[in-house]
Swiss-Prot record:
Protein's job: Transaldolase is important for the balance of metabolites in the pentose-phosphate pathway.
Similarity annotation: Belongs to the transaldolase family. Type 2 subfamily.
A single GO molecular function term of this UniProt record: transaldolase activity
Keywords: Cytoplasm, Pentose shunt, Schiff base, Transferase
PANTHER family in the cross-refs: TRANSALDOLASE
Protein name, entry field: Transaldolase
Domain of life: Bacteria
């Protein structure tokens, strides 16, 4: 019997796991997800690494070794995260080979404190890429205004990029433009475009969480009827943008030179509101050529009872536009919401990073005392 995750794969959706830890690597649980649940990639972020590193004892030996070597807290975190990502890249290498690098990808994010620093982001991206030293790594760069130029410059060096924290259609257009500009420069620099890969991580459930709060405050029947619809509408219109901007003459020239399109990646796909189906942001966002990165809870729910009915995105654009128009008429400002979500998203990652710095600093101090 075909499983729902197999059906997603057959419909053109690549399933990535939104989580990574040394425990997953050493116990074989990540390998099991590849073998049994069609997982073909991994994404990480500062919050994921904070949770992994501060839970249990998996990293104690590494911290002790770093303490003995006199490493700083930043050097220790860099060593831990890049080692985990490199090991995951090795695990996914057969997938990468089988898909010619399209899947089998593992993402690692630049220090989130650099989100507003173009040159700092470029330098960090190169440093991470060199340290991990795996062809199937993706360097995650936030889609801030300052990040757009860094995305172009990083791609121009032949480095594959995961653009993250995209909430608005306008910013998504700018991201695709930055991607195509990066490939144009990479071509001029003599890089093989067929070896440069990219995804654009478009966040879904957080849009509903914020807009639903505003709809609850309005409280009318019309407002309540729109709950749980904005995230899907926004993502579906993003796919329309993807179709539009990868059907241009500009893109045709790059494709002729061997370039592959930057795939939309649905992120923030765990359902926050228990009133909604737990597979909402998976089964309702099926379209050819997309990635869906899921926390394990969402992956398990999809595998267990997800109902995959084929493409649920193409042809939905009129309804999606109508949803966003109805929200504006009720006084829910799309531009205000997406700007807030970008700011909050960055703040959360910076906060997680600072907590991680403090926790690892404490662990290093304890290790030095013990020795």
């Amino acid at each position: 019997m075909t499983t729902p995750t197999q059906q997603l794969s057959e419909a053109g959706v690549s399933i990535w796991l939104d989580d990574l830890s040394r425990g997953r690597l050493e116990t074989g649980t990540l390998r099991k997800l590849i073998e049994e649940k069609n997982v073909v990639g991994v994404t990480t972020n500062p919050s994921i690494f904070h949770a992994a590193i501060t839970a249990g004892t998996d990293y104690d030996a590494t911290v002790a070794a770093q303490a003995a070597a006199g490493a700083s807290v930043e050097e220790t975190i860099f060593e831990i995260t890049t080692t985990d990502v490199a090991d995951a890249c090795d695990l996914f290498a057969p997938v990468a080979a089988a898909t010619k690098g399209v899947d089998g990808r593992v993402s690692i994010e630049v220090d989130p404190r650099l989100a507003w620093d173009t040159n700092g982001t470029i330098a960090e991206a190169k440093h991470l890429y060199k340290k991990v030293n795996k062809d199937n790594v993706l360097i995650k760069i936030p889609a801030t205004i300052e990040g757009l130029e860094a995305i172009t410059a990083t791609l121009a060096e032949g480095i594959s990029v995961n653009v993250t924290l995209i909430f608005s259609l306008e910013r998504y257009r700018a991201v695709i433009n930055a991607f195509q500009a990066g490939l144009e420069q990479a071509k001029e620099n003599g890089h093989d475009l067929s070896k440069i890969h990219s995804v654009a991580s478009f966040f879904v459930s957080r849009v509903d969480s914020e807009i639903d709060k505003r709809l609850d405050k309005i409280g009318t029947d019309e407002a309540k009827a729109l709950k749980g619809k904005a995230g899907l509408a926004n993502a579906r219109l993003a796919y329309q943008v993807y179709e539009e901007l990868f059907a241009t003459e500009r893109w045709a020239l790059l494709a002729e030179a061997g370039a592959l399109p930057q795939r939309p990646l649905w992120a923030s796909t765990g359902v926050k509101d228990p009133a909604y189906p737990d597979t909402l942001y998976v089964t309702e966002l099926v379209a050819p050529g997309v990635v869906n990165t899921m926390p394990e809870k969402t992956l398990d729910a999809t595998f267990d009872h997800g109902v995959v009915t084929g493409d649920t995105v193409s042809g939905t654009y009129a309804d999606a536009n109508a949803t966003l128009d109805a929200l504006e008429k009720l006084g829910v400002s799309y531009n205000e919401v997406v700007a807030l979500l970008e700011s909050e998203g960055l703040d959360k990652f910076v906060a997680s990073w600072k907590e991680l710095l403090a926790d690892v600093e404490g662990a290093l101090a304890s290790a030095r005392k013990a020795s």
